């Protein structure tokens, strides 16, 4: 099992998307479906750092969900179990490594219910046909110009793998990472490229451009698609 230290900070994959088809899909959506981080991620925000979530709301960050929590867990969404342990270390481990103590609401693997507008779409078909691993929590990000996604850590690559496909508004956008506490900066191009991003490291997005940034994000439940990018052998 590969962990964050075994993988690069960012890797451009050998899979490309048709940006025009994604833009057409986004244009076809009910624009009322965009929601703030709380509306689009009901329940799962309980398992993230509260200050970070408030920061997303402050920066007018929005998402359009394509995959949602499985219907059998919708009732638990109202009052998910937050018992993650007694010590700070235990709570951190259960949050960032997504152990089996986590409620299904907080488990991204359970966010694989395809919404009606997503079923049969170009994005769904392209992911299914080109990636070996199953996907979950597919969504569209919208970060307004001049705003930021504050530094944060999501989870280790041993739990799941994050993929991002920039769609538009990437000029003067910095994707910052801090592996080994050293800042690294990247600019991801909106040219159809798909990138693995190592969200086990602290990372942020700083938007200094003049156009809102829109990106496709999804999670892979396993590591088959990034194993060839490992910088060190499994331990």
What residue spans do the PLM features occupy?
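Catalytic core of non-heme Fe(II) oxygenases with the double-stranded beta-helix
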Residues: 122-195
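Catalytic core of Fe(II)/2-oxoglutarate
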Residues: 169-235
């Amino acid at each position: 099992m590969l962990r964050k230290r075994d993988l690069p900070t960012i890797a451009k994959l050998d899979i490309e998307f048709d940006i025009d088809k994604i833009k057409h899909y986004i244009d076809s959506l009910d624009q009322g479906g965009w929601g703030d981080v709380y509306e689009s991620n009901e329940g799962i925000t309980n398992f993230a750092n509260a200050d970070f979530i408030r920061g997303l709301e402050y920066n007018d960050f929005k998402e359009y969900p394509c995959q949602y929590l499985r219907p059998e867990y919708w009732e638990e969404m109202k009052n998910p179990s937050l018992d993650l342990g007694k010590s700070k270390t235990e709570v951190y481990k259960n949050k960032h490594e997504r152990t089996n103590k986590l409620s299904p609401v907080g488990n991204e693997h359970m966010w694989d219910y395809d919404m009606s507008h997503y079923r049969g779409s170009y994005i769904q078909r392209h992911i299914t046909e080109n990636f070996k691993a199953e996907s979950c929590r597919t969504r569209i990000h919208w970060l307004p110009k001049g705003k930021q996604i504050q530094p944060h850590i999501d989870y280790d690559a041993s739990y799941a793998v994050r993929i991002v496909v920039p769609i538009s508004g990437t000029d003067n956008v910095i994707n910052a990472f801090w592996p080994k506490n050293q800042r690294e900066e990247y600019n991801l191009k909106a040219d159809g490229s798909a990138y693995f991003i190592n969200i086990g490291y602290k990372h942020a997005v700083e938007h200094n451009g003049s156009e809102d940034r829109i990106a496709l994000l999804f999670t892979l439940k396993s590591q088959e698609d990034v194993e060839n990018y490992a910088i060190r052998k499994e331990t």
